Amino acid sequence: MASQVSPGVVLRERDLTNATIVGASSLTAAFASSFQKGPIGEIVSISSEKQLVSVFGTPKEANAEDWMVAAEFLGYGGQLAVVRAETGCLNAGSSAGVLIKNDLEWQAGVGAANTFVARTAGSWGNSLKVVAADRGADQILTLASAPATTALGTAFTTVSGKGGRIYSFDAASNELAVILDNPGSLITSADIFDEPGDGVATSVTAGAYAGLGSQNGTHTVDPTGGSGTGLRLDVTIDAGGAVTGVAIVAGGQDYEQGDVVTCAAAGLGTGASSDLQVTISAVTNDNIAVNSVKDWYTNTEIAGTGLKLSAIGPRPGTSEYASARGLAYDEMHVAVIDTTGDVSGAANTILERFTYLSKLSDGKSSEGSLAYFKDVINQESQYIFQGASLANTIEPSSAGGGEALGSDSSALSSGDKFLLLAMNTTDLSGGTDDYAYTAGEAVAAYEFFSDTENTEVDFVLMGGSMASESDTLTKAQKVVAIAALRKDCLAFVSPHKGNQISYSGSALSSADQRANTLNFFNSITSTSYAVLDSGYKYMYDRFNDKYRYIPCNGDVAGLCVNVSTTTADWISPAGLNRGGIRNVIKLAFNPNKADRDELYQARVNPIVSFAGTGAVLFGDKTALAAPSAFDRINVRRLFLNIEKRVEALAKGVLFELNDETTRYGFLSTINSYLAEVSALQGITDYLVVCDSTNNTPEVIDRNEFVAELFIKPARSINYVTVTFTATRTGVSFSEVVGR
């Protein structure tokens, strides 16, 4: 169509190089269960057993079957998409247990009333101690005796004029931790500690007084007001009503210089018309010798851990960002400590530390990255969230005026200092476990994998059995339903544990095991998107130092991963060459030939242990009951492979023009890929139709694009017949064979 209105040349480019199909780099299995820890109701990608332990914890007695199925699959080179089921577990918090399923719930405000809370649910969080520390106190003074007042924040001075506030006092050792007004002028053992607070009045001055009436004489008065108690004065007044003298009868206690006390008029004689104001001009305080001095930060132990604050990092101070704005004392450290060893294996291990964070909500590190402590912890910590404001803050000097944590630098002025935390410790508690998920909870967890657009998986693993056969069947049917609904993956299902292993009494006979297994699988829907196996293997659980029976659905899926890695998706995973099951001491049910015949006819792939070969997957059927090319694993996986790649290419055709060029580009790319599959023994022949015969004008007018693929899949050998014929010596073989 003309696009110019005057003579000229238009150059156009058409890109047909984007029609490329890329093979899968990894195979992922969907899996859901209860765990020791980890986010709930969220799909997490796991690529190794080490990562499985790190994110979801080690297996416990109640979830070991599930956990080890997942671990065995990972051992074959697969990856997992894991969902932790929502059960009755709670996160450990600073105030009480609370359920915070995942990061999204935390961001929505769930559990934010806790100062700190374990990042995921489970009793594991009860072992956590969170330590937040800033520059804190400056020194620890060992005094000759205990001061009268040792409350947090009490102002004090030394005889030489050094001052500050009290942070803490240990009565057993007379050790007083102090925050100095001027940290550059440290207290030494030569200094004398002046009792903080108030003292005994030693000198008073009477204010102006104009009384009327006969007030002459000396009157003993107990004045009111001031910061102390117990002061008693003798006030002498002449006949004219003038105060001629004030004498201290009792100096009281806890008064401060400059206090003004009131002598009521009624106490000064008959006819007095006004009160007398008296100023305390001097007080006497007790002085205490300083026996020794040491640095607070490097000598302060984190209670109950045996660790010093210096184990977290050097003393925090003021960041470059704050200093450039004239602010001070914004830096702080946060550490998470495993007090019991339940998380790390060793008690009082520092699990993680965040150093040189900022109390400024807009704080930045020296590299320019985010430094506000709340944001850094909530975004980067593997163990905790930080919610409510930290408690027990203290003024940075006796002058007061400390700024609140979380202030923005734009709201502060040069010279401002932040309130100090010194050492703020929080022990988390209230975390609970609940490994025994119900059938409903299992179904809800697997439902996260229903969405094909947002979650790409190749397999769905059933995992272990549940408490009852009916619950196990419900779980199995859900796994199969997910795969059948998605139509882009295979479900792998094992029988109920009780079908093959007796929980009490005598062991089950082979006939009982076969009958139980067949009865269980009879209820499974016929579909080519599922694979059924007969196996429970006996293996060692290194985490709990015991042997367990574990279902083999993770192994069978793992064999598919292995065959895809070493050969191709369309090669059968069964047999002596490729079907070896790993980590097998023995099988709970080792079916003989008669058992295998019944199992295979019922869509169940036997797992067999032959002498000298170990345990082997000895069948490659899908769960499809009707005879079909899709009743074999390799054919179903062949079509899944081709369908996924054709779908990816077809998405690139969307919104293009349905013309010969587009159809040819699509056709040539599909033919190229199928030729490669054919060369690798996946198919014996194929035909792709994508031209004007099936993209008619009517199809084009409906904005449709049609392609048809005809494929002859390669078939695996399931039945071998070898005939031996004995002949007489003089007989020619051509006569016997007939050729």
Segments and roles (model prediction):
Residues M1-E105, N114-R119, A328-H333, D338-G341, ...:
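Structured, hydrophobic secondary-structure cores that serve as assembly/anchoring elements
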Residues T17-N18, K37-E42, L52-V53, C89-A92, ...:
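Short, surface-exposed beta-strand/loop "edge" segments at domain boundaries and coil↔beta transitions
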Residues F35-K37, I100-A112, D134-Q139, Y167-E175, ...:
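Short, ordered beta-strand-loop transition motifs
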Residues K60-I140, P147, R165, A177-E195, ...:
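Structured, mid-chain assembly/scaffold modules that mediate subunit interfaces
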Residues I100-E105, G125-A133, R165-F169, I192, ...:
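Short amphipathic beta-strand/extended segments with alternating polar/hydrophobic composition
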Residues N126-D134, L231-V235, S274-V278, L307-S310, ...:
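Broad, structure-driven detector of short, well-ordered beta-strand segments within folded domains
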Residues L141-V290:
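Conserved, function-critical positions that sit in or immediately flank catalytic
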Residues S292, T298-N378:
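Beta-strand-rich solenoidal segments
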